[in-house]
């Protein structure tokens, strides 16, 4: 009789293995794919990479401009399907037989999906036609070798032939050491071609992007009729430490940044990436009316 009132309560039993699975669910780290997040060098905040790339590779917190490759910039600036590429199959030789140079070039071509550190061609920007050269710092730091110099020189000559304005987007670590003196020759060659462009009364727009240094700065980057720069771009010839060691003086903070150069009259304006295409279009329109 008493057993009816004092029945033993039955409980659900959980095996030790199941308990272990529950514990693992709470303690194991979440699986996040590599490359999904990037840290902004400007403000230090962590950004969702897809959102940053949709924002033209600009930080949506502080406006820091991440580096763009040549194909990305081509898509940003040129009208869709308007670009016709020049000399796309020219590749580097090894004029001083630098060990491993050919392999390095092949690796860079596979990695970047371009043949050299510059893309040249003609296209339209807001329906305004121009010859365009876009350098790429992902290809051997945008270093200027014989092919880069040759492609830009040919683009300048094509600009003269077609009577079109020239726009060069620069980004470079300077001369390409693997080509020795042949690399340094390109500074004079490109500058000479641009001098002929000036004699024809044609417009040359130089757009300095991060970083523009070395022989490129010392030659064609700084001789544009109009010189624009992206915000925060590093622009200079030698590095800060080299200069300080040479002149034995402490240099001002940020003296090689675009903002410092604008303040001291070395460039004409700083244009954010979102406004760059429209700014270039307006300049081309004004130039066209002037002619």
Swiss-Prot record:
Binding-site residues for Zn(2+), renumbered to this chain: 40, 43, 59, 62
Lipid biosynthesis is among the record's keywords: yes
Pathways involved: Lipid metabolism; malonyl-CoA biosynthesis; malonyl-CoA from acetyl-CoA: step 1/1
CoA carboxyltransferase N-terminal domain segment(s): 36-291
GO CC, one annotated term: acetyl-CoA carboxylase complex
Note on how the cofactor is bound: Binds 1 zinc ion per subunit.
Annotated EC: 2.1.3.15
Record has Transcription regulation as a keyword: no
BP-aspect Gene Ontology terms: fatty acid biosynthetic process; malonyl-CoA biosynthetic process
EC category: transferase
Keyword line: ATP-binding, Cytoplasm, Fatty acid biosynthesis, Fatty acid metabolism, Lipid biosynthesis, Lipid metabolism, Metal-binding, Nucleotide-binding, Transferase, Zinc, Zinc-finger
Superkingdom per UniProt: Bacteria
MF (Gene Ontology): acetyl-CoA carboxylase activity; ATP binding; carboxyl- or carbamoyltransferase activity; zinc ion binding
Zinc finger (C4-type): 40-62
Record field: catalytic activity: N(6)-carboxybiotinyl-L-lysyl-[protein] + acetyl-CoA = N(6)-biotinyl-L-lysyl-[protein] + malonyl-CoA
Cofactor: Zn(2+)
Compartments (UniProt record): Cytoplasm
Subunit structure: Acetyl-CoA carboxylase is a heterohexamer composed of biotin carboxyl carrier protein (AccB), biotin carboxylase (AccC) and two subunits each of ACCase subunit alpha (AccA) and ACCase subunit beta (AccD).
Function: Component of the acetyl coenzyme A carboxylase (ACC) complex. Biotin carboxylase (BC) catalyzes the carboxylation of biotin on its carrier protein (BCCP) and then the CO(2) group is transferred by the transcarboxylase to acetyl-CoA to form malonyl-CoA.
Entry's family note: Belongs to the AccD/PCCB family.
The name this protein goes by in its record: Acetyl-coenzyme A carboxylase carboxyl transferase subunit beta
Organism: Clostridium kluyveri (strain ATCC 8527 / DSM 555 / NBRC 12016 / NCIMB 10680 / K1)
Source species taxonomy: Bacteria, Bacillati, Bacillota, Clostridia, Eubacteriales
């Amino acid at each position: 009789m008493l057993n009816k009132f004092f029945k033993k309560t039955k409980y659900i039993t959980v095996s030790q293995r199941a308990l272990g699975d529950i514990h693992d669910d709470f303690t194991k780290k979440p699986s996040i794919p590599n490359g999904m997040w990037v840290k902004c060098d400007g403000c230090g905040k962590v950004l969702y990479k897809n959102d940053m790339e949709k924002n033209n590779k600009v930080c949506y917190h502080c406006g820091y401009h991440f580096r763009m490759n040549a194909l990305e910039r081509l898509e940003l600036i040129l009208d869709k399907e308007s670009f016709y590429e020049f000399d796309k199959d020219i590749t580097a030789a090894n004029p001083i037989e630098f060990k491993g140079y050919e392999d390095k070039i092949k690796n860079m071509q596979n990695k970047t999906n371009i043949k050299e550190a510059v893309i040249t061609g003609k296209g339209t920007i807001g329906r305004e036609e121009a010859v365009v050269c876009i350098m790429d710092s992902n290809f051997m730091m945008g270093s200027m070798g014989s092919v880069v110099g040759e492609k830009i020189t040919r683009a300048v000559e094509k600009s003269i032939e077609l009577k079109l304005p020239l726009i060069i987007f620069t980004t470079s670590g300077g001369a390409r050491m693997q080509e020795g003196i042949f690399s340094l020759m390109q500074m004079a060659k490109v500058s000479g071609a641009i001098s002929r462009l000036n004699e024809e009364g044609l417009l040359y727009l130089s757009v300095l992007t991060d970083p523009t240094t070395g022989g490129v700065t010392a030659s064609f980057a700084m001789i544009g009729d109009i010189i624009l720069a992206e915000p925060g771009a590093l622009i200079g010839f030698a590095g800060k430490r080299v200069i300080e060691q040479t002149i034995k003086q402490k240099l001002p903070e940020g003296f090689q940044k675009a903002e410092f150069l604008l303040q001291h009259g070395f460039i004409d304006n700083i244009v954010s990436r979102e406004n760059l295409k429209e700014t270039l279009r307006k300049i081309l329109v004004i130039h066209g009316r002037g002619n």
